[in-house]
Amino acid sequence: LKCNKLVPLFYKTCPAGKNLCYKMFMVSNKTVPVKRGCIDVCPKNSLVLKYVCCNTDRCN
């Protein structure tokens, strides 16, 4: 997950209201992201899932 301050054309921006990029991993397999997208609040990690969040709404 790359977080970006500037907006090159090929980076996506999140819609209003969901202004954090995030990526979700299974704790057992951190190399394969399960889901990625935009979210309003960064979720807390659990025993099964680990979240990586940007503090910006621009990511790839």
Swiss-Prot record:
GO terms of biological process kind: killing of cells of another organism
Question: Which pairs of positions does the record mark as disulfide bonds?
Answer: 3-21, 14-38, 42-53, 54-59
Cellular component terms (Gene Ontology): extracellular region; membrane; other organism cell membrane
UniProt keyword list: Cardiotoxin, Cytolysis, Disulfide bond, Membrane, Secreted, Target cell membrane, Target membrane, Toxin
> Which InterPro entries does the annotation name?
Cytotoxin_Cobra, Snake_3FTx, Snake_toxin-like_sf, Snake_toxin_con_site, Toxin_cobra-type
The listed locations are: Secreted; Target cell membrane
The molecular function GO annotations come to: toxin activity
Q: In which tissues is it expressed?
A: Expressed by the venom gland.
Question: Domain of life here?
Answer: Eukaryota
Q: Which Pfam families match?
A: Toxin_cobra-type
Q: What does this protein do?
A: Produces complete blockade of auricular contraction, which is irreversible at high concentrations. Induces apoptosis in leukemic cells. Possesses anti-arthritic and anti-inflammatory potential.
On subunit structure and binding partners, the annotation says: Monomer in solution; Homodimer and oligomer in the presence of negatively charged lipids forming a pore with a size ranging between 20 and 30 Angstroms.
Q: Which family does it belong to?
A: Belongs to the three-finger toxin family. Short-chain subfamily. Type IA cytotoxin sub-subfamily.
Q: What is this protein called?
A: Cytotoxin 1
Q: Which organism is it from?
A: Naja kaouthia (Monocled cobra)
